[in-house]
Amino acid sequence: MSSTGTTLSASEGDKGFRNGAAPAKSKSHSTIALLRLLAFAATLSAFVTMITNKQKITIGPFTRWSKWHYSDAFMWFVVANCIAFIYLLFAAILGLISHSPMLVKHLVILDLIVSYMLFSAASAATAVAYIGKNGISQPGWTAICGVFERYCHHVAGALVACFLGWLFLTIAVFLGMRRSPAAV
């Protein structure tokens, strides 16, 4: 007999079932997989938005372009989002297929590393976007977002998507650590 007064068979007790309730781990697996899929969608969105982002302006005989690969920070942003969305797709699938404690531990650690990478890339890109919007008066760097307005709006959208992806992944890390505290 259990402490609640119900009788559990050995197989039910081993699986964590009590009064017909499903174990909490399966709900946790699904929640973490959902968070990874949301992070996947957000980072894929940020990636696609940035690689398709360009704007051309013509002033008299001069034509100027603004493209994501003109900035090292934006290149890092694109690469980090690409790595993240590929990893997140595989991690979500693996997390649903296998519930091995060793795999769970490795995925939590990899989730943490990818979340750091996303935060690093998004922060660097945010700094460049800030300068593009506001400029810096001392070295004479002028703001370009008044001229390349559409380009700057796309960068802002990609940054929001990336930070959302980071948030979803960070929540997944916390849930994964709670589920498997020996992972970290």
From Swiss-Prot:
InterPro entries registered for this protein in UniProt: CASP/CASPL, CASP_dom, CASPL
UniProt membrane topology term: Multi-pass membrane protein
Extracellular topological intervals: 52-76, 133-154
Subcellular location(s) of the protein: Cell membrane
Transmembrane segments: 31-51, 77-97, 112-132, 155-175
Family matches, as Pfam families: CASP_dom
Sequence ranges on the Cytoplasmic membrane side: 1-30, 98-111, 176-184
Gene Ontology CC annotations of this record: plasma membrane
UniProtKB keywords: Cell membrane, Membrane, Transmembrane, Transmembrane helix
Subunit comment: Homodimer and heterodimers.
Family: Belongs to the Casparian strip membrane proteins (CASP) family.
Name used for this protein in its record: CASP-like protein 1U1
Organism of derivation: Marchantia polymorpha (Common liverwort)
Lineage: Eukaryota, Viridiplantae, Streptophyta, Embryophyta, Marchantiophyta
